[in-house]
Amino acid sequence: SRGLGDVYKRQAFIPSKAKFMIRDCKMVAEKNKINFKFNSYFPIKSLNLMRGVFVAAEDGIKDLYIDKIFNAVWVDGLNMNDEIVVEKVLKNIDINPKTFVLRAQSQNIKNQLRSKTNDAYKKGIFGAPTFIVKDKIFWGQDRLQYAIAEAIK
């Protein structure tokens, strides 16, 4: 079984790639009229935020949670490494931060994330966004049209 740390250790930080990705994200956002700001606090320690997706799913607010966390990081540029900032974001969507965080740290939630991570690893998924259509992997936002074409074949 592989943990998230194992996956991340394999992906070396390459400064030239990081610089390119920042520029590319800004270009794609501008072209598609998406409100986006590269977060100056990046990289964000996202483990607890990812666990939160499973808690939010149990509460029936997964999509809302994902949208608000995404906006906090990539639109508002908030420091989501700071627990106080995370608490404020959670409160703004009527989530009790204390209870939510406790649930996110439960063994059940940890196991769910670990299971999904292992499933992704076994399928050959290595980054986001990844689309799987008819057992074929399409990686990157620039491959969405290829994935759609494959789906309607």
Task: Indicate where each model-derived feature is located.
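Glycine-rich phosphate-binding loop at the start of an alpha helix
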Residues: 1, 46, 114
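Short, small-residue-biased leader/transition segments that mark boundaries at the very start
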Residues: 1-8
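GST-like domain detector, emphasizing the conserved glutathione-binding G-site
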Residues: 9-64, 144-153
